[in-house]
Amino acid sequence: MTGWKDIPPVPTAQEFIDIVLSRTQRRLPTQIRPGFKISRIRAFYTRKVKFTQETCSEKFGAIISSFPVLSDQHPFHRDLMNILYDADHFKVALGQISTAKNLIETISRDYVRLLKYAQSLYQCKQLKRAALGRMATLIKRLKDPLIYLDQVRQHLARLPDINPTTRTLLVAGFPNVGKSSFVRSVTRADTPVEPYAFTTKSLFVGHLDYKYLRYQVIDTPGILDHPLEEMNTIEMQSVTALAHLRAAVLYFMDISEQCGFSLKAQINLFKSIKPLFANKMVFIVLNKMDIKKFEELDPEMQQEINDLTKSGEVEILRASCATQEGVQEVKNHVCERLLVERVSQKLKAGTHSNGNIGTRLQEVMARIHVATPMDGTTRETFIPEAVKNLKKYDKNDPNRRVLARDIEEANGGAGVFNVDLRKDWILENPEWKYDKIPEIFDGKNVYDYIDPDIDAKLQALEEEEERLEKEGFYDEDDDLPDEEEEEILQKAEYIREQHALIRNEAKMRKSLKNRAIIPRKAVKKPLSQLEDHLDQLGVDTEAIGLRARAQTAQSSRGRSLVRSRGTTADPDAMDIDDGAASAKERLARSRSRARSVAATNRLQDGVQGTTLRSKAERQAKLAQRKMNRMARQGEADRHIHASMPKHLFSGKRTIGKTDRR
């Protein structure tokens, strides 16, 4: 299989430009402003240039890779393409595509380098325009190569799929000698048949089946008897097929000479192209026998035709495509000979010089070998006597065999009679057929748990238990735990409890409890915690406690809650200034008490620094924005309002009423 039919279409130069530029316009952003940063403007236009270059390279690479590489093709396909399309012209066209691809990549690199130094949007735009313009100019110059490659693609898709390695029959000869008629007769190929020469201008392929094997039949154009240099493209296709295909060659000759060429000329053509028949099976087919028989020829001409078979490599066959006389015989004979020849070639190729059969040949022989009995005796068909004497069932015969259907009809018919499904059960004891044992119990198959030796196994287990009881096996208390094991178990349980407590305390510490995480430096620790920690370290804390309490006493401020009311015990008595009170105390009592200030600012608790505080406020506003936009009363508001208020959408939308809806 060549895969030439899967080559995608090659666009023309103008179509190629439209594809590339429209793809660039569709796939990339299209808006840019002079006020943007110059780096952003450069990146915008650099991306356009590089994207266009990548698109061109991708398209050109796809075109180059889709066409076959001549050096990788079979010699037949390589020479056929050389004849039809001129291999040099084909290579030059693909080379121009590859050169254009490299030039476009060079242009892209140069203009990307220039775009790095552009100072304005106008400069970037002009550089981009120049780069894309140069790329488009290069593509326009590929007008002729692209048209040529698309024509080659179309012609390749129309070529027949010829397999050079399969079983092949190759039909050759002068024009109008009946080659296409033979191919139409033995295959389903619709080859053109007309009463004039050179009806077939290219290779046609048909397929036939012989002994469950597929053969391909190739109809070649007619060949004229002149030097190879003077042959045209149509004739060279036939010569290429004869030279490179391992096939059985059927050389057709028109002995009635109605083709316009004499029998002598047909014999001379056979001799001139005979070097192309090397290592091939050759058959001369004498066609149009219904018009003129071989025996009606001149003795000299008969002798010349018979001389062609002296080498032993050529056979003469006779047929008439008009009356189908001898056509199937020719087909069967050639296919059989070709099959035998291919098998012998495989056997010869798989045998080593020392006569041993290779591994590959053994695999092939294993596939084609048919096993037969070694003793040579004939094994006839054996039919038991009971089968021979078996009478045909007759419903009206009283001595007929009684079938289950007869029993059913005798006992009430279908729906009344229950078929005995256990009747034909094969059990060790026929009495077991009707035991009340369910097939399925608790969703399990009962038969899977039935053991024929279960009674013997149960008896053995009971005897073993009695023996163990007599030996005192169950009197030992080794399994009871001692004091050491109980102590180990208690310690293990205590360790598990401690681990659980530690884990729970860690979870409680880490949980926020609906509070913000306060930094360690902002947490105020009591003096008692400090004293406990220092006591654990062995530091005397008496002096530290006295100093802290003294600082606390000095920093205490505010009015005393108890005012001196002299010596009277009456709570309603008038305040009297004691002469012993200092002026400082009197001044403090005369001032009004200020509002109490909270110990900490809850709004700023847990947020350290102005930057973090402003960031937290912005995030809070951002979280609140959606709720405000959707007019929610809070986070728990899930009310869904009417999507189409009836007072706004009722009535008909008449002409002139849709501008307000």
UniProtKB/Swiss-Prot annotation:
SUPFAM superfamilies listed in its UniProt record: P-loop containing nucleoside triphosphate hydrolases
Keyword Transmembrane part of the UniProt annotation: no
Keyword Oxidoreductase: no
Annotated positions binding GTP: 173-180, 198-202, 219-222, 287-290, 320-322
Gene Ontology process terms (BP): ribosome biogenesis
Family annotation (InterPro entries): G_OBG, GTP-bd, NOG1, NOG1_N, NOG1_Rossman_fold_dom, NOG_C, P-loop_NTPase
GO CC list: nucleolus
Record-annotated OBG-type G domain positions: 167-339
Pfam family, one: NOG1_N
GO molecular function: GTP binding; metal ion binding
Comp. bias intervals (Low complexity): 555-566
Span list, region Disordered: 549-578
Binding, Mg(2+): 180, 200
Keywords: Coiled coil, GTP-binding, Magnesium, Metal-binding, Nucleotide-binding, Nucleus, Ribosome biogenesis
Places the protein is found: Nucleus, Nucleolus
Protein's job: Involved in the biogenesis of the 60S ribosomal subunit.
Protein family according to the UniProt entry: Belongs to the TRAFAC class OBG-HflX-like GTPase superfamily. OBG GTPase family. NOG subfamily.
PANTHER family recorded: NUCLEOLAR GTP-BINDING PROTEIN 1 (PTHR45759)
Identification of the protein by name: Nucleolar GTP-binding protein 1
Source species of the chain: Chaetomium thermophilum (strain DSM 1495 / CBS 144.50 / IMI 039719) (Thermochaetoides thermophila)
